[in-house]
Amino acid sequence: MTPAENFNRLQEIIAGYRQGMIDMQQQLVRRVAVGPDNQGPGEAAKAAYLAAELRRLGLRVQNYPAPDDRVPGGQRPNLIALLPGRTARKVWVLSHLDVVPQGDRQLWHTDPFELHVDGDLLFGRGVSDDHHGIVASIFAVRALQETGLTPHRTIGLALVADEETGSQKGLAYLLHHHPELFAADDLIIVPDAGNPEGTLIEIAEKSMLWLRFEVQGRQCHASKPELGVNTLRASAHTIVALEELAQEFNAVEPFFDPPHSTFEPTKIEANVENVNTIPGLGVFYLDCRVLPVYDLADVQAKVQQITAQMERRWDVSITTQAVQEVQAPPATPAAAPVVQALQEAVQAVYQRRAEPRGIGGGTVAAFFRRQGLPAAVWMSDALTAHQPNECVNLNALIGDCQVLAHVFCQTR
């Protein structure tokens, strides 16, 4: 059969996997894989299920666990599954096992940790982020197995822990302790971001800075405010003052989506429990996604300038801590082989032109790029990650599986 005929056969087989994909999503959703940083049990149960499924397909599976005494068993799983090709050069698809917490349960229409199917839509925590990548890549390999095709490159599936809280127990651990797994001429695909049309190939990310602000004042009875220093009021004014960051670091780069830096207040920690007490301690967080043209040290210097002004104005003490600080690595070249392979595959499946772009969100691809490994992030993304009622369209899941199958069987 010709390569085109082989791919047509793969597409037909994958189109018949609808129920199988639903069944796997169901098994993944109910195995809660929230990490210990978010008071969860970790990824062990999900990894054990997937390791068994991969071995059932005949793949060689090895676990490279990262020590972590915060989870049962004391380890975070990192699975590597290989399907031998005609050469040792590899095509990698890296997905992550962990999910974020459910958030406000009242905003969910159904149980977040039980799959709900409504027509072509699948609902549940993790169905998109990142079960989409897990399911699409596994069923692409399954289709190859059913057709008996041997790919030119060896296919590697990496299922890693800890993506949602920094990757130190996941990909960062693998790259530090097992750098031999990945090579510069490998094609590395990370299905963890994109747009609904599947036309965005992410090759660059903004720098990421998460800041924790601790505001200290003096607690007192709310009827005697002159006896205290209200940290809630000081925090509110500080949050508003931090809007100066967007004015200071105001460059626009259309290559990125969105094209400007963002500085968003997000989490607030609980202070006092009762209404009639003025809080003497306030803690809030700022999520900064900064265009690579800026150095994060300059952003932090501006933050210190703003907080110093707020300290003087409100008679409080403000300490700032960088919870996460990642200066953007060099971008993957727009003409890299992995980008070209994805463009050809997207065109073949969706009849659309996928373009390389930069994004504001952080993905594990940054760790690859920092090691000089050109990775591309791509998926047909429903844009519901981290939201209540997270969902994925089954047709997009099937289509993306076909895209990965095209890369597997057509790339040399």
Regions found by a protein language model. Give the residues of each.
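Metal-dependent amide/peptide-bond hydrolase catalytic core
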Residues: 1-9, 16, 193-198, 203, ...
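Short, solvent-exposed loop/turn segments at the edges of secondary structure
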Residues: 76, 110, 184, 206-208, ...
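Structural motif
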Residues: 89-92, 121, 156, 186-188, ...
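Short beta-strand segments
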Residues: 94-96, 158-160, 189-192, 216, ...
